[in-house]
């Protein structure tokens, strides 16, 4: 089900896309994530829990999503354990759940034994026994994760060395404001702005449907950043779909930027890098990473259609 389109929607309803999930064809639009497209197609279940085999739905809308792990594409472009909430939809996408929620639940047969199987029981029960080599593969197959790739990766990867005065990690309101403050306060300082999402704005984008002030502020701030880039692109670099994952001594930080899945880039001219590792040396670091909402604790809070309030607002937008 789709909501009525609004002016600030991140989804372009003029560009329909076709994709396949768990061997079934669906329709989505440019700007959708795989998760948002599946929700719009009334898909409820994406996985089963490890211990009890309970069907799981989507809880989050980004990196915080614990359930919707999928295997993307096949052959040399096969990628395991990707989160449906982080995959931007493209025409011809093909994905399957890491643990099929619609398969027969063989784990139901061992439910009466659950009281004898506390977390980590297999390490004490089997690790010193000769049977470990027999049961290990079976136990790991129940874990709900994708199979490891079995063929050579066809994609191209690259790395870049970068130097800057200020590195801002987080492209929401705080991060954009910090970058603008540095740029306006110095005529020579270089800034790199990093955000994990495809678009800047962070949680502010969740307010566009109801808060005109948020929309106006974002458009103005984005325009100022673009002006700095146009005037001197060496002073401001914006890395979207990028994760700062390591901070070493002397402010050496590694950022992994994803340009797309291998299959989504297959029609581009040349053989472009699918992922680029930015090796950044910076004088100062500003952390503007925001926070994740904690789920509420109550009985059956793992049922499908129970989401974080942040996630609901994000899918609406």
Which functions belong to the PLM regions below?
Residues 53-57, 93-167, 187, 218, ...:
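FAD-binding core/adjacent interface of flavoenzyme oxidoreductases
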Residues 168, 172-174, 199, 291-293:
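Residue-level detector of alpha-helix initiation sites
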Residues 174-180, 203, 306-309:
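Short glycine/serine/threonine-rich phosphate/pyrophosphate-binding segments
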Residues 201, 205, 210, 286:
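Glycine-rich phosphate-binding loops of nucleotide-dependent enzymes
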Residues 1-144, 276:
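Signature of N-terminal electron-transfer/Fe-S-associated modules in redox systems
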Residues 160-192:
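N-terminal Rossmann-like FAD-binding beta1-loop-alpha1 element of flavoenzymes
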Residues 210-224:
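Short beta-strand to alpha-helix junction loop
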Residues 185-205:
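Glycine-rich FAD pyrophosphate-binding loop
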């Amino acid at each position: 089900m789709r909501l009525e389109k609004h002016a600030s929607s991140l989804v372009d309803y003029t560009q329909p896309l076709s994709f396949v999930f768990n061997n079934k064809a669906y329709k989505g639009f440019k700007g959708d994530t795989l998760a948002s497209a599946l929700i719009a197609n009334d898909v409820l279940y994406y996985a089963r829990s490890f211990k009890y085999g309970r069907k799981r739905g989507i809880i989050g809308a980004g990196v915080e999503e614990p359930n919707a792990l999928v295997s993307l594409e096949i052959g040399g472009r096969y990628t395991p354990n990707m989160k449906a909430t982080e995959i931007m939809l493209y025409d011809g996408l093909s994905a399957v759940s890491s643990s099929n929620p619609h398969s027969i639940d063989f784990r139901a047969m061992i439910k009466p034994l659950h009281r004898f199987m506390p977390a980590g029981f297999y390490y004490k029960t089997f690790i010193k026994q000769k049977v470990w080599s027999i049961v290990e593969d079976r136990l790991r197959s129940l874990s709900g994760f994708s199979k490891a790739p079995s063929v050579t990766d066809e994609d191209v990867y690259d790395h870049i060395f970068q130097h800057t005065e200020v590195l801002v990690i987080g492209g929401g309101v705080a991060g954009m404001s910090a970058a603008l403050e540095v740029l306006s306060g110095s005529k020579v300082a270089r800034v790199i702005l990093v955000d994990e999402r495809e678009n800047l704005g962070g949680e502010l984008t969740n307010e566009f449907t109801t808060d005109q002030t948020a929309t106006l502020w974002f458009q103005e701030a984005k325009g100022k950043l673009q002006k700095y880039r146009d005037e001197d692109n060496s002073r401001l670099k914006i890395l979207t779909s990028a994760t700062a994952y390591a901070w070493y001594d002397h402010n050496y930080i590694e950022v992994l930027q994803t340009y797309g899945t291998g299959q989504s880039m297959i029609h581009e001219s040349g053989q472009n890098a699918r992922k680029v590792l930015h090796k950044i040396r910076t004088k100062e670091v500003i952390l503007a990473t925001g926070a994740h909402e904690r789920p509420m604790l109550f009985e059956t809070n793992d049922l499908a259609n129970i989401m974080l309030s942040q996630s609901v607002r994000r899918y609406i937008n």
